């Protein structure tokens, strides 16, 4: 067994994001009904790439590991930029997409859904996000 120190004074934490609403102001109203299922996904979006228009049926957050990502709300046209080291509180139910410019974006996404529930739902006529 390795010798371990139990010294909480040396542990560092930083709260990246705590919220009850998405980046665009839409409140999170409830978690999905059903047996809870947490999903963590890593996504890499190449430079000059746009994700298809889509929505999420459950609360989710992302952490940008590298690059920059712009999120665009379809209805309002409003955009929000996220840079490496920042967290994103994604919209639930609102149609949106993400896109990159000159550099790739690498992010980790955390979904709080229910068993059997899709993580992403494409706008009719759009391809699946993943």
Protein language model features and the residues they cover:
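A beta-strand edge to alpha-helix "cap/lid" segment located at domain peripheries
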Residues: 5-7, 72, 83, 120
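Ligand-binding loop in jelly-roll beta-barrel domains
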Residues: 83, 92-118
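A short beta-loop-beta micro-motif enriched in histidine and acidic residues
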Residues: 33-36, 48-61
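A short, N-terminal "cap"/entry segment at the start of jelly-roll beta-barrel domains
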Residues: 1-39, 123-130
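Histidine-centered metal-chelating micro-motifs
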Residues: 50-52, 70, 88-98
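Short acidic-glycine-tyrosine-enriched beta hairpin
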Residues: 45, 74-93
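Glycine- and acidic-residue-biased ligand/ion/polar-headgroup-sensing regions
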Residues: 56-75
């Amino acid at each position: 067994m390795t010798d371990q120190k139990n010294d909480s004074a040396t542990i560092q934490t930083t709260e990246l994001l705590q919220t009850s609403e998405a980046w665009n102001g839409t409140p999170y109203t409830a978690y999905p009904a059903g047996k809870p299922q947490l999903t963590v996904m890593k996504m890499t979006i190449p430079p000059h790439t746009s994700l298809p228009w889509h929505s999420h049926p459950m609360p989710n957050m992302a952490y940008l590991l590298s690059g920059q990502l712009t999120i665009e709300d379809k209805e309002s046209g409003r955009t929000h930029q996220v840079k490496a080291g920042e967290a994103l509180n994604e919209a639930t139910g609102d149609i949106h997409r993400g896109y990159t410019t000159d550099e790739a974006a690498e992010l980790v996404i955390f979904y709080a859904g229910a068993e059997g529930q899709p993580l992403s739902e494409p706008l009719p006529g759009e391809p699946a996000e993943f």
